[in-house]
Amino acid sequence: MARRTSFVDEDRIRDNLVSLIRIPSVTGDEDAAVSHIANWLQQFDAEIDYWNDGIASLQRDPRYPGHEVERAWAPVVVGVLRGEQPGPSVLLTGHVDVVPPGDYANWNDEPFSGVARGDRIHGCGASDMKAGLVAAMAVFEAFAESGRNFPGRIIFAAVPAEEDSGLGTLAAIRGGWDADACIIPEPTLGANGIPELVIAHAGAMSLKINVPGKSAHASKRLQGESALDHFMTIYEAMREDERKLNEAVEHPLMKVHPLPYATNVGTIHGGLWSSSVMDSLEAQVRVGVALGETIDEAEARFHDAIMDHIKDDPWLSQNPPRIRRLASGFGSAETKQDHPLVAALAESAEEEFRTTTPIAAAPYGCDMSGWVRHANVPTVIYGPGEIEQAHAPNESVSLEATCKVARTLVKTTERLLDMHVDELRAHKQVSAAG
């Protein structure tokens, strides 16, 4: 019988990837992409679960992570292949949503073109993470077409809203989906062309900071209180908090990053007129959450750092900023390095790439957090995209790397399914931070 990896077809991967890129599934508008994948699943003799989880219901869930983009629901599709014998359940999952492409003038091609040049497929979401999603689809396809002579279950889930706090993964978990091991093919390809196996990631949360000022005529600027000037005082506190947090890093996989836990000011809005002193300012800020730190603890740390910094400021001590969490964001997460999932994937990757698989931790948050924290599913990240390409103009991905990752994940899934359920579940205790 042919090896399952022989069912990984480069032409089909290219076609599926181009088709997905051409669907402009900006977060909040993922229905067409999820529907496309649901239709793709229908060609296989698979169980399909396709539903919309209403936002009102999600908001009542105590695990609700918040959301920034307006939406009425979260569309999710799950496909399941059941083997001929009982055994473990392996989940391959990824998000369909992409960030807005920004100014089209910064792109060489239309952002959702899916143009192929040599080995690179171009388009918004190519690396983050439609290539990874297509690699997972190729795994599902390989098992569907090679027969059911395997134990256990293979579960494929396409979710929305990863770019908006992981709301889609919570919807999948609320739908009753669970597994003994989970792989998320987010972008982990290194500069050397070898994907890293990510077993831990930092968390992140979004905050809104409103800074009060006092208006005055620009010619009498000293009679006013510039909200921009006062924001710069707050900015100093933010940078000091970031410095202290990163100086305290002890996790060996996190210490290799120049800035494991980053704080970033993403937007600033303020003022009404060039000839008036700015009387208010609103900033949206992304704050890193350390491994072992809960989101609530991170928020308190950030808030206390600012309030301590401004306590002697004549204006801000009497007119403090309002700091409000926009969304809970992603908690940090970790799967222990001795978990059988890590060994299975590392061995499979070494067979495919002919080199040692680097084990790593990521400085960003993703859907791994939801599966680890809310479903207690051991989860790792391993995919063909490059994080340097993510959220950037002229995003692209290597077709060759996508095919290699797909074959790696086929081999990994085979190894996991051949394990005894108890072997995986005995290791199901994972490290998670809220």
Language-model segment annotations:
Residues 119-134, 217:
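Glycine/serine-rich anion-binding loops at beta->alpha junctions
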Residues 2-121, 145, 150, 376, ...:
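Acidic/His- and Gly-rich active-site-bordering loop/insert found
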Residues 127-200, 417, 424:
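Acidic/histidine-rich catalytic neighborhood of metal-dependent amide-processing enzymes
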Residues 93-94, 157-158, 183-186, 210-212, ...:
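Short beta-strand segments
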Residues 1-11, 71, 188, 192, ...:
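Metal-dependent amide/peptide-bond hydrolase catalytic core
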